[in-house]
Design a protein with these regions (language model features):
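Elongated, amphipathic alpha-helical interaction scaffolds
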Residues: 1-177
């Protein structure tokens, strides 16, 4: 009896860390990342450049950062795209840390603040993180209602006024899709 040898190919999902980076951050696949970012950010993008994902600490005892995918688009916006399979109960903290480091590494001593570029963190999670029903949520820094009501009624506060146009979070929760 002759035994037939079969080659089984294991199919890995796009949520696998290796596959995710291979598809979106591999040299030559910039168009795939561009299309993905256009869909998420709802804007036309001319060019996307994949950057070194390592965030090098300034101090020896500072936490090192290694982003899944770091990219920059043609308007200068810097992006971190993270695939999170397990809820380690630190999504908000991790995103804030990564965003802060992406901002702090932009300017060198003596550079003008006007050179600061928008930074966006995109989390794709395999778990529910937010209480909202939407699978895609966008977080921006907005002003709270702090003015006395009479000033608000006189037009001194614009509804949903953005406190900083340089900071943005996107959460894509796969179980809600």
């Amino acid at each position: 009896m002759v035994k037939e040898k079969t080659n089984k190919v294991e199919r890995l999902p796009i949520t696998n860390d290796y596959i995710f980076k291979r598809v979106f951050a591999f040299e030559g696949n910039e168009s795939v990342l561009k299309d993905f970012l256009e869909a998420i950010l709802k804007k036309d993008i001319e060019e996307v450049e994949i950057k070194n994902p390592e965030i090098i600490p300034y101090e020896k005892d500072e936490k090192r950062g290694l982003l899944d995918i770091k990219a920059q688009i043609d308007d200068g916006t810097i992006l971190d795209i993270e695939m999170q399979m397990e809820d380690e109960k630190n999504t908000e903290e991790r995103g804030t840390e990564y965003l802060g480091k992406m901002i702090s590494e932009q300017l060198q001593e003596g550079e003008e603040y006007i050179k600061l570029k928008k930074s966006i963190v995109i989390f794709i999670t395999n778990y529910n993180f937010l209480k909202r029903n939407s699978y895609h949520s966008v977080g921006k820094v907005k002003f709270d209602e702090t003015l006395p009501e009479e000033y608000v009624n006189m037009g001194y506060k614009e509804e949903d006024e953005i406190a900083s146009k340089y900071i943005e979070f996107h959460y894509i929760e796969l179980p809600k899709y």
